[in-house]
Amino acid sequence: DWAMHFTQGSEFAFRSLWITNHPLLVGAPYSYPFIVNWISGLLVRGGMEFFSAFVVPSYIYSIVFVFILTLFYRVVFRSRGIAMLATSIFLLNGGLGFWWYLIEIKNNLSLAAIFGSRQEFTHFGEKGIEWISVITSMIIPQRSFVFGFPIALCVAILIYKEIQKRHKDWSVKRFIIAGLIFGALPMLHTHSFLALGIILACWFFTPFIHTKHKKESFFHPLFCWVAFGATALIIATPILLTFYRTTIVATTSGSFIKWFPGWFVNQNGEHSEMNWIWWWFLNWGFTLPLGIVGWFLMPKKKKLIIAPFFVLFVLLNLFLFF
């Protein structure tokens, strides 16, 4: 991924700070969340050494990433211990690939086998392991992810803290601020924009479902959400039309989103011979079943907050996003 990031950053550093044409494909629209590389290009223009302009910010983004992720869990679960545990599970994912790592060590007990195996055990296709380590597949190579995802979490934290209050105490100002940031997310990390959009769409219904506030008026929370949506729409619309028009057309024509139930174990998938439940167990281990059990044990209010993440899981198992 970094070769592509260097190319895009070079465009901003040595040509123009504003482009709408793709730096690699002649005549193609620029349809990538570019701000992270725009910042690096700006640093190069300011005199920073080229590679340092990419490596140093990415190092900072990684630290901020872990901090914001932990903060998100702490805000939701109100426990430092749970926040640390959840962050560790998020970062050290990889399913049951470690089982084959232990087998390799058993068959060849050596320092080379322990520390220098050539097999990536969180991406072991022939065994059905495809849920690659977040660190090696996302945080290190995907600069837009490590930059944009924490910002999306900040929006989620801001909205979450508001919807935990009594309806009359919701802050319109904070919803507008959240809308401003959310609307800019397509330039930061498009997938975070889409995922957070689904999550917030589900959270929209919390004041109408949660029984504690039945006697309160729903007008104020509805107004807050309208303020958020209108602000986000004003910011996001020109960005989407300028940089993602081709993607939007592809989506409406059905060529961007495809019905593909089962994902990797679909009849046309890479592991069509495997059972869907077994495939997910291989890739998530006990994390997914324990998460489902934990959801049923949660208070109703927490269930409403966590439910959108299960919605995302279901959607990604039914549709293929190109």
Give the residues covered by each predicted segment:
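Active-site lumenal/periplasmic loops and adjacent helix-entry segments of GT-C-fold
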Residues: 1-151, 190, 194
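Hydrophobic alpha-helical membrane-interfacial segments at the cytosolic entry of transmembrane helices
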Residues: 85-89, 180, 213-243
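Juxtamembrane membrane-water interface segments that cap and precede transmembrane helices
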Residues: 122-138, 248-278
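Membrane-interface alpha helices of multi-pass inner-membrane proteins
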Residues: 136-139, 174-189
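Alpha-helical transmembrane segments at the extracellular/periplasmic loop-to-helix junctions
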Residues: 141-155, 233, 258-321
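Membrane-interface transmembrane helices that cradle and orient dolichyl/undecaprenyl
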Residues: 147-148, 152-173
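Hydrophobic transmembrane alpha-helices of multi-pass, membrane-embedded glycosylation machinery
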Residues: 156-159, 195-210
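Transmembrane alpha-helix segments characteristic
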Residues: 170-182, 199, 225-230, 299-322
